[in-house]
A protein has these predicted regions:
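Conserved GNAT-fold acetyl-CoA-binding loop/helix
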Residues: 6, 23-51
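A short, internal acetyl-CoA/4′-phosphopantetheine-binding micro-motif in the GNAT/acyltransferase core
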Residues: 66, 89-97, 130-131
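Glycine-rich acyl-CoA binding loop
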Residues: 86, 97-108, 141
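Conserved beta-strand in the GNAT
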Residues: 64, 70-78, 85-90
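C-terminal "cap" of GNAT-fold acetyltransferases
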Residues: 124-181
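Conserved acyl-CoA
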Residues: 103-125, 147
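Conserved N-terminal entry element of GNAT/NAT acetyltransferase domains
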Residues: 1-16, 176-181
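A short helix-loop-beta-strand connector motif used in the catalytic cores of GNAT acetyltransferases and
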Residues: 44-63, 166
Length: 181
C-alpha cells in the first residue's frame, strides 16, 4: 500500500458514505470480497437511522479507516461494564486481502488496551458475533485469538439488518483484553 491507513472517529457527516461502504461490502458480490453475504442474507445491512442512533450512543465509538483520503473501512466498539463488543467491521472489497482488516482489528485492540483500559479497568474481554455459516471468518478470528464461547443466538430479524436466505445463527466469540495475539 502506497499510502498508510489513517483512523479517526466517525461523524454524522460520514453516514451516507458508511451506508454505501457497508451495504456494498456485505450485500453485493464484489471481486476479492470475502465479506459478502449476498448468498445468505438479502436486504440492506444498515441504514441512516441505525447509524445515527449508534453514533448518538455514549457507549459506542465508530472509527473511520481512510486510505489516500478515501473511507475504506470502519469498525465499531460498544463498551459494556466488563467487555467491549466489536461490530460494524467493514473493509472496502478493493482493500480486502491486503492485510487491512488485520491492521484495523489491531488498531482497536490497542486503542482499548492503551486508551480505555486505564479509564475503565473492569474491562476484561473483547466480544463479537459472527454468522454461523461464515466459517472462514470464524477461522480468521480464531487465528487472531478469539474463541467461540459456545453461546449461539438467533439471527436478529427485529434489528432490520437483512433477511436470511438460509438458516442463520450468531456465534459469540471472545478474546481476553490481556491477550496480544
Amino acid at each position: 500500500m502506497k499510502h498508510s491507513l489513517k483512523f479517526r472517529t466517525a461523524q454524522i457527516l460520514d453516514i451516507q458514505k458508511f451506508i454505501n461502504l457497508i451495504n456494498s461490502a456485505y450485500r453485493q458480490q464484489q471481486e476479492n470480497s470475502w465479506t459478502s453475504e449476498i448468498e445468505i442474507v438479502t436486504g440492506a445491512r444498515i441504514n441512516a437511522e441505525q447509524l445515527a442512533q449508534m453514533l448518538a450512543d455514549d457507549h459506542f465509538k465508530l472509527f473511520v479507516v481512510e486510505h489516500a483520503e478515501e473511507i475504506v473501512g470502519c469498525i465499531g466498539l460498544t463498551f459494556n461494564p466488563i467487555q467491549v463488543e466489536i461490530g460494524t467491521f467493514c473493509i472496502a472489497p478493493k482493500m480486502q486481502n491486503h492485510g487491512v482488516g488485520k491492521k484495523v482489528l489491531d488498531f482497536v485492540e490497542h486503542y482499548v488496551r492503551d486508551q480505555m483500559l486505564p479509564i475503565h479497568p473492569n474491562l476484561t474481554h473483547f466480544v463479537m458475533w459472527v454468522l454461523s455459516v461464515r466459517h472462514e471468518l470464524i477461522a480468521y478470528y480464531e487465528r487472531r485469538g478469539y474463541q467461540s464461547t459456545g453461546h449461539i443466538d438467533d439471527y436478529p430479524l427485529s434489528a432490520n439488518v437483512g433477511i436470511p436466505i438460509v438458516g442463520l445463527h450468531l456465534v459469540e466469540m471472545k478474546k481476553s483484553i490481556a491477550d496480544r495475539i
